Amino acid sequence: MSNALEWADSVKDEGVVREGFATSKSAMVHDADIAAVAAVALTSDGHDGQEYWLTGPEALTPPEKVRVLSEVLGRDVKFIELSQDEIVAQWREQGFGDDDVEFFLTMRTNPPEAGYTVLPTVQEVTGKPARTFKQWMGENAAAFGG
């Protein structure tokens, strides 16, 4: 979820999010949920040798995330979809090389099922439901000018 912080400046300054691949869903996980699962796994019996695949409780597209952002901030934030060429140019400007760009494109144009499949792992390991993107946004609204 913290990847959404990349939008903070444009949301504060212009009230917009510029992002590519508007139909690509992801089941982002809250960093606190990662920490909670790790804490249980490290301090409780029965976790030796276990692998845990973690997701958030919902798979959202970028426009859906922006709608949540607007709701939490109490103001309209506009979603502007970038073309594939525009997003690739942006990644290159940020210093990403060919291998990284190819990986990013694959993850967005043909993501693995694990990237958008909601799993119950956080609840199963911690006994608490995974935090939603709306909860994360509420905790981080100040970064977006809220």
Segments predicted by a language model, with ranges:
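A hydrophobic C-terminal alpha-helical subdomain
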Residues: 85-146
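Oxidoreductase cofactor-interface core, primarily capturing Rossmann-like NAD(P)-dependent enzymes
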Residues: 1-78, 82, 89-94, 99-100, ...
